Amino acid sequence: MKINYMFSRIDRDKGFNDNQKKYIKEDIKNNMSITFIASLFDEYERNDTQVKEIVNVFKNIDINFKEVHLIDNRVSKEDAYKYIEKTDIVYLMGGSPELEMKSIIEYNLFNILRDRNGITIGTSAGAMNQTDRVI
């Protein structure tokens, strides 16, 4: 089953609103795996901080992940592909849609992301990059 969540942003202080919680808790269960794809592959500190904050938002609604991976320039293209193949959830992070898509294409992840079943979450740029056309 293919499920896409698209957010303009997630409030890292307040977390998910009640409507978001309802659907997220229906689809995302404890001990799933999640793989984040950065929009800015060279911004390591930013990426690490955002992943920790987003994982905490899920923890606040009692969802804990068995594995958390982050794809940016510290990860080889081969490992990035393996993470996507095996993960339950892909999370496309916010930032620059153009740079995120450039990195997705450079890492040869476009087809596997497009064709995979599972849950894909995107905020801002990550939401835009889930669509066929952004104007």
Language model: regions and residue ranges:
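Proteins with a high burden of low-complexity, intrinsically disordered sequence enriched in S/T/G/P/A and R
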Residues: Y5-R9, N19-K22, S96, S103, ...
